[in-house]
Curated annotation (Swiss-Prot):
Keyword Disulfide bond set for record: yes
GO terms under biological process: antibacterial humoral response; innate immune response
GO MF assignments: serine-type endopeptidase inhibitor activity
Signal as UniProt keyword: yes
Keywords: Antibiotic, Antimicrobial, Disulfide bond, Protease inhibitor, Secreted, Serine protease inhibitor, Signal
Signal peptide as annotated in the record: 1-23
Protein's recorded name: WAP four-disulfide core domain protein 12
Record field: compositional bias (Polar residues): 101-111
Protein role: Antibacterial protein. Putative acid-stable proteinase inhibitor.
Organism: Macaca mulatta (Rhesus macaque)
Location, primary (coarse class): secreted
Gene name of the encoded protein: WFDC12
InterPro entries reported for this sequence: Elafin-like_sf (IPR036645), WAP_dom (IPR008197)
Length: 111
């Protein structure tokens, strides 16, 4: 096999790999916008999802409160949806929005 044939083969394999990887990670994005996340994290939580397709119903995979989670998109909440969030622990003081590992400040009012 000549060097030009080998080069064509390698480029072809690279293109096929890129197209296949894009198809796997792509998928159909669900409607709505992810909520704003103003929390600074000391450590990221393990992801609960990787794409919108990992989430049930209308929920989207969004980075929120230190990790990727399935959440109801902002547009859906404005239309009367339910946050359906578990809130444990007090909300941080205004101006300090850091989340330490193991704590949860979801559902706290935004400024």
């Amino acid at each position: 096999m000549g060097s030009s044939s080998f080069l064509v083969l390698m480029v072809s394999l690279a293109l096929v790999t890129l197209v296949a990887a894009e198809g796997v990670k792509g998928g159909i994005e669900k409607a709505g916008v992810c909520p704003a996340d103003n929390i600074r994290c000391f450590k990221s939580d393990p992801p609960q999802c990787h794409t919108d397709q990992d989430c049930l119903g209308e929920r989207k995979c969004c980075y929120l409160h230190c990790g990727f989670k399935c959440v109801i998109p902002v547009k859906k909440l404005e239309e009367g949806g339910n946050k359906d969030e578990d809130v444990s622990g007090p909300c941080p003081e205004p101006g300090w929005e850091a989340k330490s590992p193991g704590s949860s400040s979801t559902g706290c009012p935004q400024k």
